[in-house]
């Protein structure tokens, strides 16, 4: 199974399944001398981990990361950093009914067709549980970006279903507000509506989609390798690799369809840009403006409402998903999206430095 590694100079490889013994990753390319311990990584994992609020899956995992290699006396050595997170709260018996059935909307059918075998327990490798290791690797990238380049990578939830934050809130994000509520939302009025919507969905046994935005500030000019490794192309690749993501926007994204060139172009003065419709990337290269990326996540198919499907023998069956699941996967996806953006940015920064010494 290929496709488990991302990056060229800053490279992350993950392994593990939802109900396996542990999850793990290997991070290559971290420069030597970075102060690093589990305490630097754990806060981001705590933001992603399940069971932290009534709005997410009740599965409880401590998600305590353990660094196995690549750090000596509190400093990175420049060698591979190995990390693991042990799984503790698996309930594999919840998935016995789908051993021979395909859950509609999930990767069950495609994994079975591609590999001829699948770990049906919690989705196995296709589960979003795997993203814990992306967050761990991303925490290292965020720390290096912040300490060595002053780059800040932060995200917020912009919409759940038809409830969206106010446009004026987006213009001036209050990051303290984002970190003060379980929705990672900068709009207090939207938080209340999110709460009502999620409560109703849990009663109905249904789920809902979401939209979230990641902003990277203080990114230097010049990152990106046209034409095939454009910065926006690599960001889109990384973000589309997150479970349940169905669309990626850079800057104004799909809204550009209704814009005119006279309005969309980011005009410049000696003092700088007058707008940022391009989301901080021009011609596939960072412009020095904040990089803005938005993703849309589908409603999870893990719901208790019966659905039609087929089994291994291609016979019609009814599927009712058991187990513990998020009514909106977009909530816990905020730190995951931050991690993927940070991984791409650090990789491109290292590539840019290597090319322009």
From Swiss-Prot:
Entry protein name: Chorismate synthase
Q: What does the record's cofactor remark say about binding?
A: Reduced FMN (FMNH(2)).
Biological function: This reaction introduces a second double bond into the aromatic ring system.
Top-level division of the source organism's lineage: Bacteria
Q: May I have one GO cellular component term?
A: cytosol
Taxonomic source organism: Pasteurella multocida (strain Pm70)
Checking InterPro entries in the record gives:
Chorismate_synth, Chorismate_synth_AroC_sf, Chorismate_synthase_CS
* Chemical reaction(s) catalysed: 5-O-(1-carboxyvinyl)-3-phosphoshikimate = chorismate + phosphate
Query: Which cofactor(s) does the record list?
Result: FMNH2
HAMAP family xrefs:
Chorismate_synth (MF_00300)
Please indicate if the UniProt record lists Lyase as a keyword. Answer: yes
